[in-house]
Amino acid sequence: MDVDVKRLCVRIMLSVLLLLGLAACNDRRPLPQGDTYVIRNDGGGQLISAEADRAVLRLWSGPVEIEGYCNSACLIFTTLDNACLDPELILGFHGANITVGFVGNPQVSKYLRNGIKQKFDDEWQHIPFTEIHRITAQEYVALDPQTRICS
């Protein structure tokens, strides 16, 4: 096969993979606007989208308040340095529907800290993705004292 044809095939394959990756990331949260970014009643969604959104919020560095409920992939926002938990927040944990290598449960676990990480690794990651274990913001902070309650 000619070198130019090989290069063209590689470019086409890389373009297709890029498009597939972008298509998989289809539940992004809105970009930050204003003084405070509020995450409210977030059921989670695709982990790859949450990771991208977390990176945006980390770089933005404005205050992030998490209110209502925060389940599943939303949990990775709780450890942002600029995040705080509303005192009435309920947080929900379960295992990933797909866990292969570093994908799924290890992807969530790497963002957690202290007692929350320990509980997730030891217990909560084994909860089927069709069920959920809920805790309050106060219970969360008791397990991860680095996390702040919003004032």
Q: What does each model-identified segment do?
A:
Residues 12-20:
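Sec-dependent N-terminal signal peptides
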Residues 26-80, 145-151:
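N-terminal secretory signal peptides
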